[in-house]
């Protein structure tokens, strides 16, 4: 019995919340009048006195050369990074060009087999 009453109460609360939310979301005649009375922003009024080109010119970034020690340090760090990156790229190309000879393959296989045999012997 208590469960049924709790369910009915929950349904009533949910219905009330939905109704309250819908009433606040839809503009009534009072809210429409208030929005009509609001004056347009100052920017729209001054559009004729202050054209868009002038506003755009204010926001364009200008290139300023600054020889501060911090900027010099940053550019030096960038140069070092670029040099290191080129070294890594060059070393990758060198390793890619190296061909694996048949003798080196045999040596690697032999050392691998020796390692496996020594592991098997340790287990015994």
UniProtKB/Swiss-Prot annotation:
Superkingdom of origin organism: Bacteria
Keyword Transmembrane helix: yes
Residues covered by region (Disordered): 24-124
GO cellular component: membrane
UniProt feature, compositional bias: Basic and acidic residues: 30-58, 67-81, 89-113
Membrane topology of this protein: Single-pass membrane protein
Cysteine-cysteine disulfides: none
Alphabetical UniProt keywords: Membrane, Transmembrane, Transmembrane helix
Keyword Oxidoreductase in record: no
Cellular compartments annotated: Membrane
Membrane-spanning parts: 2-22
Entry protein name: Uncharacterized protein YhcC
Originating organism: Bacillus subtilis (strain 168)
Lineage per the UniProt record: Bacteria, Bacillati, Bacillota, Bacilli, Bacillales
Protein encoded by which gene: yhcC
């Amino acid at each position: 019995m208590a469960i049924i009453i709790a369910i009915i109460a929950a349904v009533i609360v949910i219905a009330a919340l939905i109704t309250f939310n819908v009433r606040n979301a839809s503009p009534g005649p009072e809210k429409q009048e208030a929005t009509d009375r609001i004056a347009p922003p100052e920017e729209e009024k001054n559009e004729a006195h202050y054209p868009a080109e002038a506003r755009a010119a204010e926001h364009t970034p200008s290139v300023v050369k600054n020889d501060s020690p911090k900027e010099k340090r940053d550019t030096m760090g960038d140069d070092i990074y670029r040099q290191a990156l080129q070294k890594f790229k060059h070393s990758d190309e060198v390793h890619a060009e190296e061909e694996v000879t048949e003798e080196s393959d045999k040596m690697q296989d032999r050392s691998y087999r020796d390692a496996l045999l020594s592991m098997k012997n340790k287990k015994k």
